[in-house]
């Protein structure tokens, strides 16, 4: 039997980074990567400036650095943001491969086999798992880093209710024939959530993120197609018509082209409610959950890569110090407050304010006020948290325009 100190199921950012840090610290680590080779994670691929500053080695992965972004209100009003601190957009194939290779180079055993939670069994010395190819491995600690649909997470911490999940779906489409493609985030009209267009080195990732309990596939898919067509067609004014149903020959030709060339994807994202954070337990004496498997994603934006990497780092520090159960208190102290505050803000962020969507008013105000615009840019880039967001916005708004 193959024996290890830790068995990590899932080789996304959380699992691979944990494997790297633990192996560097002297632990014997098995990292199980059950995803078919070349199959990308369904994700926009955005990595915040906060993450890039915390782990500058991420800049060595092949990606695109973003210094400016166009933010659109539900009615189509545009706010152009020039970011003080850039963020990056990666192909998840390239990004995940980069982190997995670092884990392997650090001494972790990377095993390209799928693991079912049903085949993970507790023993007197820890855990035994049997892979899809009937290979058997044992370890003292079992780590679930297998994403939002985590089978390990359901086994160890229980299933999350649908209200604690979000849905993201979209298309990978060709880059425009000419010009520099803009990075765009557009808040949805009459829906919770937003659409995005994230240019990567060889394609554009289009998508929509919304809550699972509000999800209706056909109307949202229609909305995404309107957004995609509006993205490729040049705007006639500063108010881009993303959400209009265009039937002119140019739009129809573009639709046919995208139907033939675009590749669809879909995923679930954790978006835990405030009350869930009060009771959710994500580690024990011989197990722990990381990243999306633990529920660590921003409930407002769905961003999870920073929390995947940070949870991996916090867990590795606890384990290497011989205090694995400290992980529960450490993550709550480190970033739990931000996640809870985001959960509390989600309804208001996508609610109404002064007779219009809050996102509409926010962009209107930022278009006329440099201080508010700067804070909004910091929020988008990941440098501005939610805990002191209200105070920062009020302070900026009171300063002269």
Task: Locate predicted features.
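Extreme N-terminal starter segment of soluble prokaryotic enzymes
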Residues: 2-6
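Glycine-rich FAD pyrophosphate-binding loop
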Residues: 7, 11, 21-42
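Predominantly flavin-linked oxidoreductase catalytic cores and closely associated redox partners
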Residues: 11, 25, 102-243, 295
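N-terminal Rossmann-fold NAD(P) dinucleotide-binding loop
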Residues: 15-16
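Generic enzyme active-site microenvironment
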Residues: 31, 144, 290
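A conserved beta-strand/loop capping segment in the N-terminal third of enzymes
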Residues: 49-100
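FAD/FMN-dependent oxidoreductases across multiple families
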Residues: 117, 136, 214-318, 324-326
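C-terminal helical "tail/cap" subdomain of flavin- and related membrane-associated enzymes
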Residues: 317-401
